[in-house]
Amino acid sequence: MPGIDKTDRAMTSVTAQEALDFHSQGRPGKLEISPTKPMATQRDLSLAYSPGVAVPVKAIADDPATAYDYTARGNMVAVISNGTAILGLGNLGALASKPVMEGKAVLFKRFADVDSIDLEVDTENVDEFVNCVRFLGPSFGGINLEDIKAPDCFIIEQRLREVMDIPVFHDDQHGTAIIAAAGLVNALTLTGRDFKTAKLVCNGAGAAAIACIELIKAMGFNPENIILCDTKGVIYKGRTDGMNQWKSAHAVETDRRTLAEALDGADVFFGLSAKGALSADMVRSMGARPIIFAMANPDPEITPEEVALIRDDAIVATGRSDYPNQVNNVLGFPYIFRGALDVRASTINDAMKIAAAEALANLAKEDVPDDVAAAYQGNRPRFGPQYIIPVPFDPRLISAIPMAVAKAAMETGVARKPIEDLKAYGQQLSARRDPIASTLQRIVERVRRQPKRIVFAEGEEVQMMRSAIAYANQQLGTALLLGREEVMRETAEREGIDLDRAGIQIVNARLSKRVGAYTDFLYSRLQRKGYLFRDVQRLINTDRNHFAASMVALGDADGMVTGLTRNYSTALEDVRRCIDPKPGHRVIGVSIALCRGRTVLVADTAVHDMPTSEELADIAEEAAGLAKRLGYVPRVAMLAYSTFGHPSGERSERVREAVKILDRRRVDFEYDGEMAADVALNARVMEQYPFCRLSGTANVLVMPAFHSASISTKMLQELGGSTVIGPLLVGLDKSVQIASMSAKDSDLVNLAAIAAYNAGT
């Protein structure tokens, strides 16, 4: 399908085993269900189930609309498929489609905080499918149909919309259409054209193509200026071969019979067909400043590079993330459902689709503020031929599109719960962002533009090998695997790992021509610290961390990752023998904790055991600096067991003094303390202290000691269901990251990407 970029170029280098491992590691699959109410006591159970549950049951029986108040229905979308048109794989059946549907469900959650469950219906009979889905209506606030073959998808969607009172949306059709329409609006603006006069040719007559044509017609595009083509050529009035009612609805009077003839003098090409369908001669025959949307996946009808060789005046969009102007369904469906659910819409009508397309188009025209520029790797985009569609990780999407959809639903009378305070609604939407996922994606994209050489110090470990390969496969740079080649190759053969692929380089310390330089370098640092020359020789020849850190220190690598075989403090001691702190900075560890959509940075989780007041102030500055680099506006809480002097104690005084030091330094970020964790993180509790200088709940927590920082983050991870990244090492003069000994492959790849990112900033 031309929407969600499930098979883009950056992902084609993922190995089959990596994909299987990703889906099978830990709990198999990509979804789980977590309770939103406490289940700790007998009373909790009595409220959640019998006898307490009888009360909302009776309320819903008396007034069905209250189901939205007492159940999860109002934020629940079902992703439903029969697997008859899976990605580019075809009809592989309902069960085989489950990984795709789980993936779609997690995209709903990731991008718009919509809860979603996948349902695979094992039938190709349209009547059976419709009956199955229609009777599930009470369970959900909306239905997202996915990967259903044409023309069944048209029939199924239409019939379900007629019999259900909740939104039913076939994303393969309408998602692609909405994003393509948004891009078309902007491309026409840039080329001085409009919907009334532009001439468009669409190649492909499947679900997405038909939906694209229908939507732009609804937006005012002149039907007489649209020619639809399929594998048999132009769909013209009177044609009978290979026709159906959906194609016939868009047949036109024309004497043109082939795609090449149709494109002669055309302004716009919509491709929803196959690789190579658009030839160089066809591109040459198009009008001035042609608009080419080559949306076939995984390979477009023609690539931007191929177009550039033919002419330099074209605006090009594809379905791929490695080119500008990506037509990606994830720009649409999460936010469209978000807006529809929030007003309890009974359907998603044309007005709501058009509103989504226009909001997306307008977003690309707006000036990009500083906090949003980070989503574009610091390269602030400007409306133009290379930027007619925002990228999926633009944080403004969650605010702009649901708002437009909700307004359209209210204006057209399909909203059963109109929003009274739109300003407050906008703030609620912004609060649903998942910033750290966006941050990691921004880091990856930035590194792809400036690839780095990263040393994976424990190269003989299977996890390091797999992580190095993943780093190279994601086109982040060269992965330098440090270790004995014969040992690594023996392990790689046993584990089915290919070490000969591009982007992997094996470095054997004993055989390196740089051993002498590294030894001299390290000896110059350690000779007055009790080390003999032979001691340093031994470290360089036999100790992976010292060798790797020396590589980084002398510029033979941009960064390093280590930690699997030694505890954090030992690994850090190794590194610090070779690399100093940045001038004027303090080395600390910062962990990033994600829990229920909130992101909090916690420091110091790695270095300082019982920091002094001066050190606590330094830690606050370093952590706030990292928060800024990651795209956050820091609000720093200096934590203690007491809050603003009560109860008093010697250890709290140390934290209070740190706040005074920050006052004297006149730092440029919000901070306050000392305060307990509930005051820092709970807005209602914070309101009891109106003098608190934080403008909102804290997103940077400075702990009073290492033990409290380490214990709290590990408890969050193990008991609180949080995702914890780090500790990230901050303050060194060179880029080094140290993993925990229990780190997973994905953790190591993230740390390598962060090391590469820091090396370039």
UniProtKB/Swiss-Prot annotation:
Residues binding NADP(+): A205, G206, A207, A208, N297, N329
Residues where a divalent metal cation binds: E146, D147, D172
Cofactor: Mg(2+); Mn(2+)
Domain of life: Bacteria
EC class of the enzyme, as a word: oxidoreductase
Comment on bound cofactor: Divalent metal cations. Prefers magnesium or manganese.
GO terms classed as biological process: malate metabolic process
Active site: Y49 (proton donor), K104 (proton acceptor)
Region (Phosphate acetyltransferase): 438-761
Molecular function GO labels: acyltransferase activity; malate dehydrogenase (decarboxylating) (NADP+) activity; metal ion binding; NAD binding; oxaloacetate decarboxylase activity
Alphabetically ordered keywords of this record: Metal-binding, Multifunctional enzyme, NADP, Oxidoreductase
Region feature (Malic enzyme): 1-437
InterPro entries: Aminoacid_DH-like_N_sf, Malate_Decarboxylase, Malic_enzyme_CS, Malic_N_dom, Malic_N_dom_sf, Malic_NAD-bd, Malic_NAD-bd_bact_type, ME_PTA
PROSITE patterns registered for this protein in UniProt: MALIC_ENZYMES
Catalysed reaction, written as an equation: (S)-malate + NADP(+) = pyruvate + CO2 + NADPH; oxaloacetate + H(+) = pyruvate + CO2
Protein's UniProt keywords contain Plastid: no
EC number: 1.1.1.40
KW Nuclease (keyword) present: no
Pfam families xref list: malic (PF00390), Malic_M (PF03949), PTA_PTB (PF01515)
Family designation: In the N-terminal section; belongs to the malic enzymes family.
Subunit structure: Homooctamer.
Protein name, as recorded: NADP-dependent malic enzyme
Gene symbol of the encoding locus: tme
